Amino acid sequence: PGKTRLINHFLIDNAWYLVDLPGYGYARTSKTKRSEFSKIITDYVLKCEKMHFLFVLADIRLEPQKIDLQFIEMLGMNGIPFAVIFTKADKLSKTQREKSVERSRAALAEQWEELPRMFVSSSQHSTGREEILGFIGECLNV
């Protein structure tokens, strides 16, 4: 967790870029450094003209975090299309995952009339992989 320190661009199929941004929340670093990451992310997101879509990654084991809700609100206020990917699904039972996603839906419903698309994922078991890749394909075909 909290390993990305730079903006990393990955060219996919010689056609589009997947951009990995530093995390703005949890990171094993100083508060000052996290604040710098937050500014880098916000500047990039607000100034990137060719961005098709943004994925907000959130640890499914945690309650909806204030910083995530604030970031999502900023995306909405600026008309930036996004979806939420809940990570580390392998760490919870199916019932726990469902409860966690429902808590996040309820928290987002306080701010949003229409909820963003949400995916549950696990890198350990490839959970959600096909759905996310399919969604990326839909976004790129627009």
Map each language-model feature to its residues.
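Amphipathic alpha-helical transducer elements in NTP-driven molecular machines
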Residues: T4, R34-S38, L69, S126-R129
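Inter-motif core of Ras-like GTPase G domains
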Residues: K33-R61, E73-I85
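Conserved nucleotide-binding/hydrolysis micro-motifs of P-loop NTPases
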Residues: W16, G23-G25, R61-E63, K88-S93, ...
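Canonical P-loop GTPase G-domain recognition
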Residues: K91-V142
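Switch I (effector-binding) loop of TRAFAC-class P-loop GTPase G-domains
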Residues: P1-N14
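Conserved ATPase-coupling elements of RecA-like P-loop NTPase cores
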Residues: A27-T32, E63-L69, K94-E98
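Switch II (G3) loop of P-loop NTPases
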Residues: A15-K39, D59-L62
